[in-house]
Amino acid sequence: MELHCPQCQHVLDQDNGHARCRSCGEFIEMKALCPDCHQPLQVLKACGAVDYFCQHGHGLISKKRVEFVLA
């Protein structure tokens, strides 16, 4: 899913919870949501890896399944 810059409406480059607009240079925080219940996910970082955990009963969520939205 492509997210667009709220300032200039260009497509954002996404990287692990952050987004950057190539056009205007804006840096934007993103929020990770569970694809099943759409609740915020807990971000677990260890040894260079980033994992996502749903505290509402859906457990560990693959990075490929996480829904990112602008925070």
Curated annotation (Swiss-Prot):
Coiled coil: none annotated. It comes from the Bacteria. GO terms for biological process: bacterial-type flagellum-dependent swarming motility. SUPFAM superfamilies: YfgJ-like. Disulfide bonds: none annotated. InterPro entries: DUF1407/YfgJ-like_sf (IPR029037), YfgJ-like (IPR010807). This is Uncharacterized protein YfgJ. It comes from Escherichia coli (strain K12).
